[in-house]
Amino acid sequence: MKHILRIFRDYWLLFIILVGFTYGVVMANLWLPDKMSEIVNNGIIKQDMSAIWNNGLMMILVTAAGGFCSIVVGFLAARIATGMAQKLRLKLFERIESFSLADFNKFSTASLITRSTNDIQQIQTTSIMLLRLALMAPIMAIGGLQKAMNNAPDLSWIIALAVFVLFVVIATLFTIAVPRFKKLQTLVDKLNLVARENLVGLKVIRAFHNEKIEQKKFQEANVELNKMNLFVNRLMMLLDPIMTLVMNFSSVAIVWFGAHLISSGNLQIGNMMAFLEYAMQVIISFLLLSMVFIMVPRAAVSVRRVGEVLDTLPSITDPKSPKKLPKDAKGKIEFKDVTFTYPDADLPVLSDINFVAEPGQTTAFIGSTGSGKSTLINLIPRFYDVSAGQILLDGVDIRNLKLEDLSGQIGYVPQKGVLFSGTVASNIKYGNAEASDKLVEKAAKIAQAEEFISELKNGYKSEIAQGGSNVSGGQRQRLSIARAIAVEPNVYIFDDSFSALDFKTDAKLRAVLAKETKNKTVLIVGQRINTIMNADKIIVLNEGKIVGQGTHQELMKDCEVYQEIAASQLSEDDLQKISIAAKGVL
């Protein structure tokens, strides 16, 4: 709630104006029945046409003024609520963008999407209702009750009884509905999760012909959400007929008992009519308040869910007193006694990691699945922070660098090429918005992407669909590599980034890349020995520990794990042939 209130402070002036116009609406509504009473008592009964005309004209003017005030209230309420929702949505997005991978793991992607859209929409809708009704209804209820008692105090018990019945009904519905609202948002999360999994994994689903299984999973989530929605909506729908019954019985009771008072000379017809109007205003006010009370718990769930994200402080932030890299920074990476354990995990993924990656050299990492290769290189851009030890960049602990300065030193290429909606050029410029057209073309040429880009209808201005769905996997990887090159970093990180390339393209790319990065630090994660065997240094990982460092030839002599990997992948003849063919490539 504190986040909502902080944003609300920006709209205090509009809120004060809204309060003023709301007061105008209420005063107009409370004034009209009294004038109607005067028309009946002093005009119609006494046959005084001037009283009818004068009071009638005043009623028309007041009605017009009240209508104008109501329009302004609606406009201001929408302006405040939508403005708050916009700022809250931006604040939430900025917080999510600042999360480390460890922070992301606290929430599912589907849940974050729901909180950023559905929950904020719920808050916006409720805010409009609160601003329009929560102020007006109590004032109208109190004012209407006072006016009613002034006109016919002997009938006030009817209003008290009607309000009591409404209170019991609303309290009962409130008690039943509130727990369901939280469940409802959880079910929306679940449905979004199933939908997202199906959209992302559509190819796999079709490949294994599991459409019916996935449809069943979606239908189960859909039916569960539908049942809960139906239950809540049916519960809310009970309020309307109950309200109608209360209003009708109240009207009949007022007319019945009012007629007896009129016949006994204790009440005038105009006063009874005014009392009836005020009674309806009081009852309607309670109906409006009940709508607010029903909406607020659901919005409160959304506020809590959004607050959970906003209250999650990023675990990786800029240091309070950041250090600067030396002016002659070259990109030297050094791991000193690094240990890393994932949050909530019992055992470390990496233990006692020590190595130096020198500028001008290619350092490769290899190991069995789960050995910690990708985790290790994910520590360098600070996707995670080390649990113990240090990672130094040109002698400076990366935790003492501003995140912007650190990222400016790194060209990162993930295993799966990730592209964004936009053009080919905008994707290559993604890491360096100031990159010139010449640099973009150079990066594409080095990444072996120039040929297929030139074949596109609009070349570098060709549109890339969301996720790069209109280009092949190999083309996505080449554009990802070009994006890293365009940053012109001192450190290149390739997380098995050549897996989607054919052998010929791979060889060409590596040959050109070797020239471009001859004075840079290059880190490569490989799954196959033939992709990393010509690196200047190969680091072998096994169960989170370094079990070997050296060249291919040295490791073939001294490292048993490396020998096992080589034996499982290639024959001796293949190793010799690849070694000869690949010389000078890296």
Regions found by a protein language model. Name each.
Residues 48, 52, 143, 147-164, ...:
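Helix-loop-helix
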Residues 46-47, 82, 90-114, 118-120, ...:
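Short intracellular "coupling" helices and adjacent cytoplasmic loop segments at the cytosolic face
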Residues 10, 14-27, 129-184, 256-267:
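Transmembrane helices of ABC transporter permease
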Residues 98-102, 118-131, 135, 139, ...:
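An intracellular "coupling" helix at the cytosolic face of ABC transporter transmembrane type-1 domains
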Residues 326-586:
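ABC-type nucleotide-binding domain
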Residues 33-37, 74, 89-93, 110, ...:
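Alpha-helical transmembrane segments of polytopic integral membrane proteins
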Residues 1-32, 36, 44-60, 65, ...:
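Membrane-integrated ABC transporters
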